Structure formats: structure tokens, C-alpha cells
């Protein structure tokens, strides 16, 4: 993976997973590169410890892009901000928020989020040993409709 570019990995994934014409696949790849803000580095190798390549945030956005190529309505992400500095983590969450605002359902696990990252989420579900112990619809999302914050505890 270190020697392939985001454009190449998106094209490869599109060829494997999409039943579209070559032109439609190419257009999907170009749109995805633009949507993910990867225009500047679309032809840069991903890289690794030994090969200089994408930054951590660019690499994270490219990995999300591999899943987005099929235009799923639901996206599951496990720790999408792990290993990123706070600014890059916020940038990744802003991308996910934009996707959610455009109708995509995003489910993500985040362990020990900063208050800045925590504030980006619309809904929170806290689980312990597989049981829901706390659920909240954030005040920010519905405050204009409800005029109050809401939360529900489960026992």
C-alpha cells in the first residue's frame, strides 16, 4: 500500500466493487478526491515508515475514501482519530460531519475524546460490557427545535 497513490487505490477499489462504465468510475474517483480534499496529494504515494508520503490526516481521509467509493448509506469507523494530532483529528471529524449532513449515517467509536472532538458528535451512546448505560442527543443539534437538552439513562 505504501507505493500506491490515493487516485490509484480509489481506481483499483472502483474497478473491483462498482458495476459502472470506465468513465463513470473515473468520475466517481475524481469526485471523491475533491470531496475528501485530496486534490493536492492525489498522486502522492501513501508512504510508510521508510517511504515519505501522505500526512497522517491525508492517509486517514484516503482510507475513509476507500469505503466511500461505493457510496454507502452507512459508514462504520473504529477510532478514526487515533494517532492524529488534535487539528488533524478535528479536520477528519469535520469531513465526517459534512458526510453526515449530506445524508450519510456515520457510526464511530472514539475512546477518550477531547472536549473539542466530543462536541462534534450529534448523538452519544455509552456502553459498558455490551450494555447501553447512557444515551444523549446533543443539545446543539436539536436546541433550536426543543429549546432544551435531552438525555436518557439506562439501568
Give the ranges of each region predicted by the language model:
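Q-loop/switch helix immediately C-terminal to the Walker
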Residues: 2-19, 28
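ABC ATPase signature
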Residues: 4, 46, 54, 67-68
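Conserved ABC ATPase "signature" region
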Residues: 11, 26-45
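Hydrophobic anchor residue at the start of the ABC signature
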Residues: 64-65, 92
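A short, proline-enriched helix->beta-strand linker immediately N-terminal to the Walker B motif
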Residues: 68-74
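Catalytic Walker B motif of ABC-type/P-loop ATPase nucleotide-binding domains
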Residues: 75-79
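Helix N-cap at the start of a conserved alpha-helix in ABC-type nucleotide-binding domains
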Residues: 86-87
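Conserved switch/coupling elements of ABC/ABC-like ATPase nucleotide-binding domains
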Residues: 125, 129-134
Amino acid at each position: 500500500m505504501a507505493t500506491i497513490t490515493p487516485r490509484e487505490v480509489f481506481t483499483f477499489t472502483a474497478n473491483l466493487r462498482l458495476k459502472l462504465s470506465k468513465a463513470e468510475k473515473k468520475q466517481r474517483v475524481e469526485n471523491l478526491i475533491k470531496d475528501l480534499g485530496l486534490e493536492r496529494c492525489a498522486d502522492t504515494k501513501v508512504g510508510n515508515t521508510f517511504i515519505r508520503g501522505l500526512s497522517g490526516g491525508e492517509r486517514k481521509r484516503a482510507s475513509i475514501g476507500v469505503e466511500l467509493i461505493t457510496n454507502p448509506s452507512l459508514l462504520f469507523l473504529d477510532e478514526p482519530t487515533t494517532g492524529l494530532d488534535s487539528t488533524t483529528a478535528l479536520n477528519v471529524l469535520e469531513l465526517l460531519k459534512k458526510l453526515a449532513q449530506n445524508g450519510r449515517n456515520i457510526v464511530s467509536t472514539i475512546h477518550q475524546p477531547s472536549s473539542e472532538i466530543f462536541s462534534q458528535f450529534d448523538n452519544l451512546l455509552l456502553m459498558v460490557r455490551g450494555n447501553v448505560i447512557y444515551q444523549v442527543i446533543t443539545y446543539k443539534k436539536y436546541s433550536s427545535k426543543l429549546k432544551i437538552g435531552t438525555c436518557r439513562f439506562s439501568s
